[in-house]
Amino acid sequence: LVASEDRVYCRDANRQTFYYANISPQIGVFNQKYWAALEKQVQTWGRSTQQSVYDKVYVTKGGTINKLLTNFTGTLKANDQLYPTTDADGKTVRGLIVPAYYYMAILSEKNGVYKTIGFYVPHAETLPQKPTADDFLVYAVSIDKLEQETGIDFFCNLPNEIEKTVEATYSADDWAW
Protein backbone atom coordinates (compact mmCIF):
# COMPACT_ATOMS: atom_id res chain seq x y z
CA LEU A 1 0.00 0.00 0.00
CA VAL A 2 2.01 2.89 -1.32
CA ALA A 3 0.65 6.31 -0.40
CA SER A 4 0.42 8.82 -3.23
CA GLU A 5 2.67 11.13 -1.20
CA ASP A 6 5.38 8.43 -1.22
CA ARG A 7 5.65 8.79 -4.99
CA VAL A 8 5.84 12.50 -5.75
CA TYR A 9 9.18 12.35 -7.55
CA CYS A 10 7.57 11.75 -10.96
CA ARG A 11 4.09 11.66 -12.46
CA ASP A 12 4.23 8.02 -13.65
CA ALA A 13 5.38 6.77 -10.25
CA ASN A 14 2.56 8.68 -8.56
CA ARG A 15 -0.04 7.31 -10.98
CA GLN A 16 1.02 3.78 -10.05
CA THR A 17 -0.24 4.37 -6.51
CA PHE A 18 -3.78 4.38 -7.92
CA TYR A 19 -3.58 0.91 -9.51
CA TYR A 20 -6.02 -1.69 -8.18
CA ALA A 21 -3.07 -3.73 -6.91
CA ASN A 22 -2.36 -0.89 -4.47
CA ILE A 23 -5.87 -0.56 -3.08
CA SER A 24 -7.38 -2.11 0.04
CA PRO A 25 -10.75 -1.33 1.64
CA GLN A 26 -10.21 0.82 4.72
CA ILE A 27 -12.59 2.43 7.17
CA GLY A 28 -12.61 6.11 6.22
CA VAL A 29 -11.64 7.56 9.60
CA PHE A 30 -8.90 4.92 10.00
CA ASN A 31 -7.42 5.76 6.59
CA GLN A 32 -7.77 9.53 6.81
CA LYS A 33 -6.63 9.99 10.42
CA TYR A 34 -4.55 7.33 12.18
CA TRP A 35 -3.09 5.51 9.17
CA ALA A 36 -2.40 8.76 7.29
CA ALA A 37 -0.58 10.16 10.33
CA LEU A 38 1.51 6.99 10.68
CA GLU A 39 2.36 7.17 6.97
CA LYS A 40 3.44 10.80 7.40
CA GLN A 41 5.67 9.84 10.33
CA VAL A 42 7.34 7.12 8.27
CA GLN A 43 7.69 9.53 5.34
CA THR A 44 9.67 11.88 7.59
CA TRP A 45 12.05 9.02 8.32
CA GLY A 46 12.44 8.29 4.63
CA ARG A 47 12.99 11.92 3.79
CA SER A 48 15.45 12.37 6.65
CA THR A 49 18.06 10.53 4.58
CA GLN A 50 18.87 13.98 3.21
CA GLN A 51 19.71 15.18 6.73
CA SER A 52 21.83 12.06 7.33
CA VAL A 53 19.61 10.61 10.06
CA TYR A 54 19.44 7.40 8.03
CA ASP A 55 21.24 6.39 4.85
CA LYS A 56 18.32 4.27 3.64
CA VAL A 57 14.82 3.44 4.83
CA TYR A 58 12.84 0.47 3.49
CA VAL A 59 9.10 0.21 4.12
CA THR A 60 6.65 -2.62 3.52
CA LYS A 61 2.95 -1.97 4.13
CA GLY A 62 -0.17 -4.03 3.77
CA GLY A 63 -3.31 -5.48 5.27
CA THR A 64 -3.75 -8.93 6.73
CA ILE A 65 -5.37 -11.47 4.47
CA ASN A 66 -5.11 -14.21 7.10
CA LYS A 67 -7.15 -12.16 9.60
CA LEU A 68 -10.25 -10.39 8.30
CA LEU A 69 -12.60 -7.81 9.79
CA THR A 70 -15.72 -9.91 10.34
CA ASN A 71 -19.28 -8.86 11.22
CA PHE A 72 -18.35 -5.18 11.20
CA THR A 73 -20.87 -2.37 11.02
CA GLY A 74 -19.37 1.09 11.06
CA THR A 75 -20.76 3.96 13.05
CA LEU A 76 -19.58 6.61 10.58
CA LYS A 77 -20.99 6.89 7.07
CA ALA A 78 -18.68 6.52 4.10
CA ASN A 79 -18.62 8.96 1.16
CA ASP A 80 -21.62 7.17 -0.37
CA GLN A 81 -23.58 7.91 2.85
CA LEU A 82 -23.73 4.20 3.71
CA TYR A 83 -22.34 2.57 6.82
CA PRO A 84 -19.42 0.28 5.98
CA THR A 85 -20.16 -3.36 6.77
CA THR A 86 -18.58 -6.78 6.48
CA ASP A 87 -20.13 -10.21 6.76
CA ALA A 88 -19.11 -13.25 8.80
CA ASP A 89 -16.42 -14.03 6.20
CA GLY A 90 -14.88 -10.55 6.40
CA LYS A 91 -16.21 -9.42 3.02
CA THR A 92 -17.99 -6.27 1.91
CA VAL A 93 -21.36 -6.42 0.15
CA ARG A 94 -19.37 -6.45 -3.11
CA GLY A 95 -17.22 -9.39 -2.03
CA LEU A 96 -13.97 -7.59 -1.19
CA ILE A 97 -12.04 -8.97 1.76
CA VAL A 98 -11.37 -6.44 4.51
CA PRO A 99 -8.24 -6.81 6.65
CA ALA A 100 -8.64 -6.85 10.42
CA TYR A 101 -5.15 -5.33 10.75
CA TYR A 102 -2.84 -3.16 8.71
CA TYR A 103 0.91 -3.35 9.15
CA MET A 104 4.18 -1.64 8.35
CA ALA A 105 7.62 -3.21 8.51
CA ILE A 106 10.40 -0.62 8.49
CA LEU A 107 14.15 -1.13 8.14
CA SER A 108 16.71 1.66 8.32
CA GLU A 109 20.40 1.53 7.56
CA LYS A 110 23.06 4.01 8.64
CA ASN A 111 26.76 3.33 8.13
CA GLY A 112 26.11 -0.41 7.85
CA VAL A 113 24.03 -0.56 11.06
CA TYR A 114 20.45 -1.78 10.66
CA LYS A 115 17.43 -0.95 12.81
CA THR A 116 13.83 -2.15 12.48
CA ILE A 117 10.39 -1.42 13.83
CA GLY A 118 7.02 -2.89 12.96
CA PHE A 119 3.48 -1.65 13.42
CA TYR A 120 0.50 -3.99 13.67
CA VAL A 121 -2.57 -1.77 13.83
CA PRO A 122 -6.17 -2.90 14.32
CA HIS A 123 -8.44 -1.72 11.51
CA ALA A 124 -10.86 0.27 13.67
CA GLU A 125 -12.81 3.51 13.89
CA THR A 126 -11.77 4.05 17.50
CA LEU A 127 -8.07 4.85 17.11
CA PRO A 128 -6.85 8.36 17.99
CA GLN A 129 -7.66 10.84 15.24
CA LYS A 130 -4.64 13.03 16.03
CA PRO A 131 -2.15 10.37 17.10
CA THR A 132 1.12 11.13 18.85
CA ALA A 133 4.31 9.07 18.87
CA ASP A 134 3.02 7.39 22.04
CA ASP A 135 -0.19 6.44 20.22
CA PHE A 136 1.86 4.84 17.43
CA LEU A 137 4.06 2.99 19.92
CA VAL A 138 1.01 1.22 21.36
CA TYR A 139 1.02 -0.86 18.15
CA ALA A 140 4.79 -1.08 17.65
CA VAL A 141 6.13 -4.63 17.46
CA SER A 142 9.31 -6.41 16.51
CA ILE A 143 9.58 -7.64 12.94
CA ASP A 144 9.63 -11.21 14.27
CA LYS A 145 6.23 -10.58 15.90
CA LEU A 146 4.93 -9.00 12.70
CA GLU A 147 6.11 -12.03 10.72
CA GLN A 148 4.35 -14.32 13.20
CA GLU A 149 1.09 -12.38 12.83
CA THR A 150 1.17 -12.04 9.03
CA GLY A 151 3.01 -15.14 7.86
CA ILE A 152 5.33 -12.94 5.76
CA ASP A 153 9.13 -13.10 5.90
CA PHE A 154 10.17 -9.45 5.81
CA PHE A 155 13.71 -8.35 4.91
CA CYS A 156 14.65 -11.88 3.86
CA ASN A 157 17.39 -10.51 1.58
CA LEU A 158 19.49 -9.38 4.53
CA PRO A 159 22.34 -11.70 5.53
CA ASN A 160 20.83 -14.26 7.94
CA GLU A 161 22.78 -13.12 11.02
CA ILE A 162 21.80 -9.49 10.50
CA GLU A 163 18.18 -10.43 9.79
CA LYS A 164 17.99 -12.61 12.88
CA THR A 165 19.40 -9.88 15.12
CA VAL A 166 17.49 -6.84 13.85
CA GLU A 167 14.13 -8.58 13.53
CA ALA A 168 14.13 -9.90 17.11
CA THR A 169 13.59 -6.57 18.86
CA TYR A 170 13.04 -2.89 18.25
CA SER A 171 13.78 0.27 20.18
CA ALA A 172 11.64 3.38 19.85
CA ASP A 173 14.80 5.37 20.58
CA ASP A 174 16.26 4.25 17.23
CA TRP A 175 13.71 6.42 15.41
CA ALA A 176 13.50 10.19 15.01
CA TRP A 177 10.07 10.97 16.45
Residue ranges and their predicted role:
Residues 1-177:
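Domain-level detector of nuclease and nuclease-like folds
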